[in-house]
Amino acid sequence: MSNKPIADMIETIEHFAQTQPSYPVYNVLGQEHTYGDLKADSDSLAAVIDQLGLPEKSPVVVFGGQEYEMLATFVALTKSGHAYIPIDSHSALERVSAILEVAEPSLIIAISAFPLEQVSTPMINLAQVQEAFAQGNNYEITHPVKGDDNYYIIFTSGTTGKPKGVQISHDNLLSFTNWMITDKEFATPSRPQMLAQPPYSFDLSVMYWAPTLALGGTLFTLPSVITQDFKQLFAAIFSLPIAIWTSTPSFADMAMLSEYFNSEKMPGITHFYFDGEELTVKTAQKLRERFPNARIINAYGPTEATVALSAVAVTDEMLATLKRLPIGYTKADSPTFIIDEEGNKLPNGEQGEIIVSGPAVSKGYMNNPEKTAEAFFEFEDLPAYHTGDVGTMTDEGLLLYGGRMDFQIKFNGYRIELEDVSQNLNKSRFIESAVAVPRYNKDHKVQNLLAYVILKDGVREQFERDIDITKAIKEDLTDIMMSYMMPSKFLYRDSLPLTPNGKIDIKGLINEVNKR
């Protein structure tokens, strides 16, 4: 039976609370919470929130990790007409301060201990939330978040300047959710059993909670204290009865460091959903070897267009013939175009900037009209967004990714995509993972390219010195890479830094190289 679109997220959750009250919605390391619990707890907390007399539709910060109380609080806020701003408990203090400054929330709900002192915003802590649950208040839903009201606001992690709060409405959320639960590429099963690993402050989390709640499934979550410890992570992951794995490719690469991450040990996994960063052929091939029968989905999209706008199931033919995986067929309700530098639409096959339009496009950045005007506009009478990504559309309607416009550099007269360099480096038989980083001179011109490299197991022992490894890598890539793209310096690391969202922190490495 195919999944049907939903008309309202809260009404759908309420429906499952009535029809399957004892079915688990949330599982934290074996501790279960049911749809009945979620309704009762969110109702009771919504009643308490209403009593606070907050300004109508004002945003509320929710601070914490992957606790059940986070989800129940989100639902309570939606019922009581407030957008929520999730902030992960591992966020840097400066970032938390910057978000409060931009968002001006009417309330902070701190599921984890709030790290800032002397905050003027009213606050509710975990004990008070649990006390609200225990009151068992009934709640009549009369003023929920609906239509163009903000459902959630996620702050993107800009490394310079203030973070930008992307406002996602209930209509935006429905556009994404209904595509995901009905699209043939995702082929999402009913009652999905979903890994809930990415933090709620990262919009990849919407890719697990939205379809799961829309289809009456169960979220299996791992506290970040576990995901940050390899031994604990592997021990915990193998015990989870999950069918759908949702993460960045980097997190899957981390899981594949364990030989036990395979279909024999985890026979229940039927789907892998990837978004948030590029899925390489190399990672997908390794995953296909480990899970030969699982469906691997490569999805793409910016936070500003509600999680993702395109997706494709990776085929064996793609893995055998392509150097770079396509990023998907675009959503039917979200016309996606390629434009040139003058803003003209380009024909299929020509490379330019990816522009997305339609009902999933955000209304803009919270309290930031200047940045909103730069990135959001109208295109053919639809709300549209400049992704800042380079792409090409094929005649078959497949979107191809060409890298970030802001990761394009000019070096010795050549225009170079840093991601192209990284992709080519990763083709060396000596390299497990690598990224290319530019070093600038005082005039901000690119002086040279550096490569940060993780070597494959056993490679270092084959060579006496790093310089010999570098020579071997360069020889290995002679026929693959143009000489002007070859980094002049190779730095060997055991690991590469990740952002809090689990992506390789390229901007951080650029800052490190240039001592910013």
UniProtKB/Swiss-Prot annotation:
PROSITE patterns tied to this protein: AMP_BINDING (PS00455)
Reaction(s) this enzyme catalyzes, per UniProt: holo-[D-alanyl-carrier protein] + D-alanine + ATP = D-alanyl-[D-alanyl-carrier protein] + AMP + diphosphate
Pathway the protein contributes to: Cell wall biogenesis; lipoteichoic acid biosynthesis
Pfam short name (any one): AMP-binding_C
SUPFAM superfamilies (alphabetical): Acetyl-CoA synthetase-like (SSF56801)
BP GO terms, sorted: lipoteichoic acid biosynthetic process
InterPro entries xref list: AA_adenyl_dom, AMP-bd_C, AMP-bd_C_sf, AMP-binding_CS, AMP-dep_synth/lig_dom, ANL_N_sf, DltA, DltA-like
Residues given in the record as ATP binding sites: 156-157, 298-303, 389, 401-404, 503
NCBIfam families on file: AA-adenyl-dom, D-ala-DACP-lig, PRK04813.1
Function: Catalyzes the first step in the D-alanylation of lipoteichoic acid (LTA), the activation of D-alanine and its transfer onto the D-alanyl carrier protein (Dcp) DltC. In an ATP-dependent two-step reaction, forms a high energy D-alanyl-AMP intermediate, followed by transfer of the D-alanyl residue as a thiol ester to the phosphopantheinyl prosthetic group of the Dcp. D-alanylation of LTA plays an important role in modulating the properties of the cell wall in Gram-positive bacteria, influencing the net charge of the cell wall.
Protein name in UniProt: D-alanine--D-alanyl carrier protein ligase
Organism: Streptococcus pneumoniae serotype 4 (strain ATCC BAA-334 / TIGR4)
